């Protein structure tokens, strides 16, 4: 099976995560996309709710959207969530699968600062979500990594790993920080959160400020 991997803090998960993943699945003809909540993200100070809550919200999305599954391998880990470590584990557990690691352009531009980033090319393909019409500057040092590995979606794949797909994605102007700020102000940003996530946040009194959450 062709499996997309979308990792993140999902603090909380919102349509800015869900819609691009759906577009990637459609364009690359993936069988599934696995949502993988991080436990301890190496590049962030922490999260605003527990790993259990973020995992539960991801499960709600998987229940609502059949194309998604939840991978809890990082959420259950007590050490930082390094992608190379995770993909090494996944390829051992599921050697029959072909993995596509989904990331945004910001993550790709800082990719060489990731822990053991070179290993990922032996474990999976990279899928970089970009705005339509966006091009990487010819002088950008990432061109040396991108150019020999860039692969067109329409062409057959020669191997189970090592290629980079640049996928045009509908721009989603949704920020987890802004979502949390609204929630802490007592505003439910209903346009960017699935109903199941809104209900979970309300029921569990997450991201609360001084006032009770109200509908936007």
From Swiss-Prot:
| A GO term, aspect molecular function | nicotinate-nucleotide adenylyltransferase activity
So, what pathway does this thing act in? Answer: Cofactor biosynthesis; NAD(+) biosynthesis; deamido-NAD(+) from nicotinate D-ribonucleotide: step 1/1
Biological processes, Gene Ontology terms = NAD biosynthetic process
Q: Which reaction does it catalyse?
A: nicotinate beta-D-ribonucleotide + ATP + H(+) = deamido-NAD(+) + diphosphate
**Pfam short name (any one):** CTP_transf_like
Q: State its Enzyme Commission number(s).
A: 2.7.7.18
Q: Which CDD domains match?
A: NMNAT
Task: Tell me yes or no: is Transferase among this UniProt entry's keywords.
Answer: yes
Write out the transmembrane intervals: none
> By its UniProt entry, which SUPFAM superfamilies does this protein fall under?
Nucleotidylyl transferase
Q: Which keywords describe this protein according to UniProt?
A: ATP-binding, NAD, Nucleotide-binding, Nucleotidyltransferase, Pyridine nucleotide biosynthesis, Transferase
Enzyme kind, highest EC tier: transferase
Q: Which family does it belong to?
A: Belongs to the NadD family.
NCBIfam families recorded: cyt_tran_rel (TIGR00125), nicotinate (nicotinamide) nucleotide adenylyltransferase (TIGR00482), PRK00071.1-1 (NF000839), PRK00071.1-3 (NF000840)
What is the recorded function of this protein according to its Swiss-Prot or TrEMBL entry? Answer: Catalyzes the reversible adenylation of nicotinate mononucleotide (NaMN) to nicotinic acid adenine dinucleotide (NaAD).
- The entry's protein name is Probable nicotinate-nucleotide adenylyltransferase
Lineage of origin: Bacteria, Pseudomonadati, Pseudomonadota, Gammaproteobacteria, Alteromonadales
């Amino acid at each position: 099976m062709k499996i997309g991997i979308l990792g993140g803090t999902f603090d909380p998960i919102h349509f800015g995560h869900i819609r691009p993943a759906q577009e990637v699945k459609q364009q690359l003809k993936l069988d599934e996309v696995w949502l993988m909540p991080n436990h301890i993200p190496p590049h962030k100070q922490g999260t605003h709710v527990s790993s259990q809550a973020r995992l539960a919200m991801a499960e709600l999305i998987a229940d609502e959207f059949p194309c998604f599954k939840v991978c809890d391998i990082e959420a259950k880990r007590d050490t930082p969530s390094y992608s190379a470590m995770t993909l090494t584990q996944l390829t051992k557990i599921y050697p029959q699968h072909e993995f596509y690691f989904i990331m945004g352009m910001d993550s790709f531009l800082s990719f060489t600062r990731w822990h053991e980033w070179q290993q990922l090319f032996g474990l999976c393909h990279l899928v970089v979500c970009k705005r339509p019409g966006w091009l990487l500057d010819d002088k950008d040092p990432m061109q040396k990594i991108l150019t020999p590995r860039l692969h067109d979606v329409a062409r057959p794949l020669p191997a189970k790993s090592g290629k980079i797909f640049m996928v045009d994605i509908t721009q989603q102007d949704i920020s987890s920080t802004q979502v949390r700020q609204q929630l802490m102000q007592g505003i439910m940003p209903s346009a960017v959160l699935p109903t199941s996530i809104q209900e979970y946040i309300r029921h569990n009194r997450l991201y609360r400020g001084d006032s009770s959450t109200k509908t936007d």
